[in-house]
Amino acid sequence: MELQIGRESGQTLHKILYVFFICKKSVTFCCMNFVKKISCFVLVLSFLSLTYVFAQDAAIYLWKDVKGMKNEPSVMFMHKAKKSDNTDQKSPCVIICPGGSYHHLGLYNEGFCSAKWFSENGFTAFMLKYRTNESFYNHPAMLEDIQRAIQIVRENAKEFGIDENKVGVIGYSAGGHLVTMAGEFFESHNELKKLGIDTGVSLRPDFVVPVYPVVSMQDDIAHKWSRKSLLGKNQSQVRKDEFSMELNVPDNMPPTYIVVAKDDPVVDYNNSLRLYDSLVKKNIPNCKLTVYEWGKHGFGMVNKEFMKAFHWNENLKEWLKEISIIE
């Protein structure tokens, strides 16, 4: 596979784009195709602006060498592991999926802050800018993107200096649903195979971390905006069941660590409880649910009051040690 890797530069441009990112407003045009192109352009500018704040090592475009997919905007940003010693040792890897109701992406606290923390703790981190409904995408675009990201990481493990047997995923809110799909659908919904891509590597992540995740598409606890953005107009009960993660846990589900706050006002925390119950019923090993009394929604990896009170990232780190991803 020939990787399409770009390196960002130009601090003055980044300063301008950072201001643009903070101030930008959504603009609606009459022509849908034009909106799609403009939305993609705005997203690219937004990501470039954030590189001024969070240095990255490379931008890897997912679909540049795939026939019929070359114009797709999906990209992941690599942050190399910071190693204090033994620089020849392969690092574990994590692919990060920000949330945003499958409509947009929460880049700061859920994306780049996460990448920074994982990088500082010995992981090579890939922050995935997957396609969303803001640019008029629905399923299977999102699942295609995360499966493609896993494929690229594993096929290029030697070049990236990572351990191909320690490739995990973490996702927030709707991104939590996406990484759970990656953990459940790597065989039953192989979207790359449908595109004629023979991966030659496993699409099964080695660990899954859904944080305050969207889980269920069932009417009683579904996050309606995420469901609409993912499924589009076809929201039949069959589709709701198919994409309710608590109903589809396979026997070979990866180890899963679920994090949620009980006072979450956006995504009902019972989403997390249902997923965990399903994991337990399936006897999936090394699964854990951590429910915090408060924290609401969207705390991500920002070192604010919630992080200082509960140190959820350090609790995650201990679990990663327990499952032998890190020492």
What spans do the regions from the language model cover?
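Mobile cap/lid helix-loop segments that gate and shape the active-site cleft of serine hydrolases
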Residues: 213-248
